[in-house]
Amino acid sequence: MLAILYDRIRPDERMLFERAEALGLPYKKVYVPALPMVLGERPKELEGVTVALERCVSQSRGLAAARYLTALGIPVVNRPEVIEACGDKWATSVALAKAGLPQPKTALATDREEALRLMEAFGYPVVLKPVIGSWGRLLAKVTDRAAAEALLEHKEVLGGFQHQLFYIQEYVEKPGRDIRVFVVGERAIAAIYRRSAHWITNTARGGQAENCPLTEEVARLSVKAAEAVGGGVVAVDLFESERGLLVNEVNHTMEFKNSVHTTGVDIPGEILKYAWSLAS
């Protein structure tokens, strides 16, 4: 039996439930906040479960559940190692660098003065991101030294571990869009353009989804990026730049509600069939 782990039911999760029923897959919904996780014990909520699909909005909650099920010998999509690699932008960048994949110039500083020095060395504008976050939140396009100094001071005052790590990337000029590629297992199954007049193109921030031709180059780079973080079911974000395609991010609990109609691909069905193929 397939367990779909969740902490909030979004349209994406509803689509997964509906497709599981349509495909005739035996499944159960497991609400993670109410799941007792006692090591060495399998709770009644997991009776008969042979594989799990992790769909929690909370990264820490999903990671904890994935670790627990893995300890019980239940395969989880995605594996804890993949969640860790994708959930931390610096970890993602390091994994991509180790795999030799093209990405925007990236650096991390743990000190305000070093962060300022790196921004100056990169040249303005630069992009400052939290190492943990999604939906394009808390991203800043820093246009000059005065803005950099003010932003770094604000982050220091805010406190919190993620504001003490300064993740810095070069600003990449894009053609008003980026590319999101959906990778399931060893296959890139669909891709969309995310268009926006704003430099942040996330659909959660108002970007518009359009079908993107899944070229061999796009598919090959996306699958390699997925493999770099450990594989499974991920969404790979690509930039089109003067240097060619660059991998910007890899997302481990991808949203697809705006992409099924756009691409004509049964993304939830593909995810479910892949997860079911891993049942122990």
Curated annotation (Swiss-Prot):
Residues noted as binding Mg(2+) 1 in the record, renumbered to the chain: D237, E249
Domain ATP-grasp, first and last residues per copy: 93-276
Keyword NADP: no
InterPro entries given in the database record: ATP-grasp, ATP-grasp_RimK-type, ATP_grasp_subdomain_1, LysX/ArgX_preATP_grasp, LysX_arch, PreATP-grasp_dom_sf, Rp_bS6_RimK/Lys_biosynth_LsyX
GO biological process, one term: lysine biosynthetic process via aminoadipic acid
SUPFAM superfamilies in the record: Glutathione synthetase ATP-binding domain-like (SSF56059), PreATP-grasp domain (SSF52440)
Intervals of motif N-[TS] motif that is essential for LysX substrate specificity: 258-259
Catalyzed reactions per annotation: [amino-group carrier protein]-C-terminal-L-glutamate + L-2-aminoadipate + ATP = [amino-group carrier protein]-C-terminal-N-(1,4-dicarboxybutan-1-yl)-L-glutamine + ADP + phosphate + H(+)
Annotated Mg(2+) 2 binding sites: E249, N251
Cofactor binding annotation: Binds 2 magnesium ions per subunit.
Keywords: Amino-acid biosynthesis, ATP-binding, Ligase, Lysine biosynthesis, Magnesium, Metal-binding, Nucleotide-binding
Pfam hit, one: LysX_preATP_grasp
Pathway recorded for this protein: Amino-acid biosynthesis; L-lysine biosynthesis via AAA pathway; L-lysine from L-alpha-aminoadipate (Thermus route): step 1/5
Gene Ontology molecular function, alphabetical: ATP binding; metal ion binding; ribosomal S6-glutamic acid ligase activity
GO cellular component: cytoplasm
Superkingdom of the organism of origin: Bacteria
Enzyme Commission number: 6.3.2.43
Binding residues for ATP: 89, 129, 133-139, 169-180, 194, 202
Oligomer status and interactors: Homodimer.
Family: Belongs to the RimK family. LysX subfamily.
NCBIfam families: LysX_arch (TIGR02144), rimK_fam (TIGR00768)
UniProt protein name: Alpha-aminoadipate--LysW ligase LysX
